[in-house]
Amino acid sequence: DGLAAHDLSAARARLASCELPFNLSESYISLSDLGGSVEAVAVPRLLTQAWIDVVDSADLPLRRVDWLLSAAQRGLMQLTNDWDGDLVWLLIDQGSGRLVLHRGGVPEVDHSFSADDVDGSHQLIRQLIGAWQGLLDEPQPLGWWLSISDDLSPHWCSIVEGTAGEQNLTQRLTWSPELWDGDGFSEALSPVEHLAMFALHQEEQ
């Protein structure tokens, strides 16, 4: 809090006083505005340069570098801008789950879990949401965004309790990137990758 998303110098000074799982002096820092707060993402310089070299060796143009979840979250905020309540973002991919609970555009809870047991995961998610709402002064109606593939969606959509006033805000994205298959092979984007690419596309307009 109290930082501007464009003030990298102030952010580095503030982060220097924190216990961090990375070496600040050897990392690139990216800042994003989140509902009046600032999200900081760091990545080692050597790792970034290694990926730049990979792109260069493939003779592909590199226009920008971004973090998948950070970009996807920006897309999420764009698409749910009209929602006034609290926001639940549920990500399920290859047996792994992630629950991110937002209030006022700020992610307050970020919890990863195994999603192999759907019923058990439903119970865990409800417990986490209940505990979170118990800490809030005035819990708001819940809106859900489900970043889940179509084949898994039927197992998870029931977690949204419409009878309790909850709403499923998930929608089909209006833009998709063109597939590139130089070697005759293409793979569909996961929902969170699609959301991130959608955000980057919108920001380029």
Language model features by range: what are they?
Residues 1-205:
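Hydrophobic/aromatic-enriched cytosolic interaction surfaces used to assemble or bind macromolecules
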